[in-house]
Design a protein with these regions (language model features):
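Nucleotide phosphate-binding/pyrophosphate-handling subdomain across enzymes
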Residues: 2-10, 20-30, 243-343, 358
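Conserved beta-strand positions in the Rossmann-like core of class I SAM-dependent methyltransferases
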Residues: 12, 35, 137, 347, ...
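N-terminal leader/targeting and accessory segments in enzymes
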Residues: 1-96, 100, 246, 358
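Residue-level signal for inorganic ion chemistry
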Residues: 15, 27, 71, 112, ...
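C-terminal helical cap/extension that packs against the catalytic core
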Residues: 43-49, 333-388
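Short beta-strand "acidic-cap" motif of Rossmann-like dinucleotide-binding folds
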Residues: 33-38, 137-138, 160, 392
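Short internal beta-strands
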Residues: 32-39, 215-219, 321-324, 341-352
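Phosphate-binding loop of NTP-binding sites
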Residues: 62-68, 75-216, 223-227, 400, ...
Length: 420
């Protein structure tokens, strides 16, 4: 079902945040009759109402499926919801917003997935394409919905598309010309149910690839689906230039981006220019300021244990004051506690703070139960000395106290900039 087939169809969009809003817009433009649903009864949907979208907010009712030909699901909507399960039981196709975009766009897609490093690698690849003078758009989980490019992207542009596991749940025809898997580590187990199910979803990026496509995977990674040409990368690869962004994990990201860019036909001179000048993205091991010799680093995007471990490893020669906690993802925190060096300290906040505190104390790490971010910043700033690092890398989601990880990182930045 492409653009022509959507005309006259009755399509239900489930979830009307950023991705759902973009999907509804493009569906209306394709001539579909659009029904929009979101459980948030106070959601601002005036723009959709002006487009003629039939809106239903609040209570989820299966009756909304009557007469529906297609369901488009936003990434934040779990598969076990009433409407999604009801659609499957009725044989109604369920697409992700990414699937809708992939069907409506003819541009070559460079897809990037993985547990950690997706946004940094996607934005770095955007910088590589621009350094080569090649038209490019960066979209997907990185911020701009893929469907928002329909009708606006240049015909010859590549699309670098960051793909989360949520976005890969309901894809059928997505075929990235180049697909990149950075890593797979435990995350979102509360959504997927098991690590195996999570990993299987990540690997869907390769399922539809053909022999003339390229799959970029970590060195030594196991079997993958699809028939694409396989290219491997590792953090010790020889690169066209050393990346400006610090940390061994970012060298891995740079190696993956280099392999992907070469697969897209970009030369090493442009890759080198981007590696030397790309400064990274906010909330990923971002230096906020240095005050009296203490560096304050915002890694609010460190929403799982694996990401926090990478952040800790970025400062091997500094005493760390690490702010941890938030809404956990059913992970064990003992491996994180074991990564603390002698002299490091933890400051725990949020719903999962106590669980993290117990793991740290068992490992002999000093812990301050701060509960809130402002208290944690105050306590860590008071304890830190010159050459120390105060690091926000929570190893948890933010939703218990903040709208999202960006809001948490912004709050940390504001608190740090207020320190005198």
């Amino acid at each position: 079902m492409g653009r022509a087939e959507l005309a006259g169809r009755r399509v239900l969009v489930v979830g009307l945040a950023r991705s759902g809003m973009a999907a509804a817009h493009v569906l209306v433009g394709a001539g579909a009759s659009v029904v929009g649903y979101d459980q948030n009864g106070s959601l601002e949907v005036g723009r959709l109402r002006e487009l003629g979208v039939e809106l239903h907010l609040g209570r989820e009712e299966e009756r909304l499926l009557q007469g529906i030909d297609l369901v488009v699901k936003s990434p934040g909507v779990p598969g076990e919801t009433v409407l999604v399960q009801g659609a499957r039981q009725r044989g109604i196709p369920v697409w992700s917003e990414i699937e809708l975009g992939a069907r409506l766009l003819s541009n070559p897609i460079l897809g990037v997935t993985g547990t950690n490093g997706k946004t940094t690698t996607s934005e770095l690849l955007g910088a590589v394409f621009r350094a080569a003078g090649r038209p490019v758009e960066v979209a997907g989980n990185v911020g701009r919905p893929l469907t928002s490019l329909v009708g606006s992207v240049a015909d010859d542009a590549w699309i670098v598309c960051e793909l989360s596991s949520f976005q890969l749940e309901d894809v059928e025809t997505l075929e990235p010309k180049v697909g990149v898997l950075l890593n797979i580590e435990p995350d979102h187990l509360d959504r997927h149910g098991s690590f195996d199910a999570y990993a299987e979803t990540k690997l869907r990026i390769f399922e539809r690839q053909a022999a003339d496509d390229t799959a970029v995977v970590p060195r030594g990674f196991g079997p993958i689906p699809g028939t694409a040409r396989r290219v491997e990368f590792a953090g010790d690869d020889e690169l066209p230039a050393e990346p400006l962004i610090p940390g061994p994990h970012n060298r891995e990201n740079a190696a993956a981006a280099t392999a992907a860019a070469r697969a897209a036909g970009i030369g090493d001179d442009a890759i080198a220019e981007a590696l030397r000048t790309f400064e990274g993205v906010p909330h990923r091991i971002e230096l906020v300021r240095e005050l009296r010799g203490v560096r304050y680093v915002n890694d609010s995007k460190g929403t799982n244990v694996a990401a926090a471990l990478r952040a800790l490893a970025s400062f091997p020669d500094s005493r760390l004051h690490v702010i941890l906690g938030g809404l956990g993802k059913n992970e064990a925190y003992e491996p994180l506690a074991a990564a603390f060096k002698a002299g490091d300290a933890g400051y725990v906040i949020g719903t999962t703070g106590e669980k993290i505190a117990r793991a740290l104390e068992t490992a002999g790490v000093p812990v301050t139960r701060a509960e809130t971010l402002d208290a944690a910043v105050a306590a860590s700033a008071a304890a830190a000395e010159a050459t120390d690092v105060v690091l926000l890398s929570p190893a948890c989601a933010s939703f218990d106290q903040f709208r999202d990880f960006e809001a948490r990182g912004d709050a940390f930045r504001a608190l740090v900039l207020e320190l005198a």
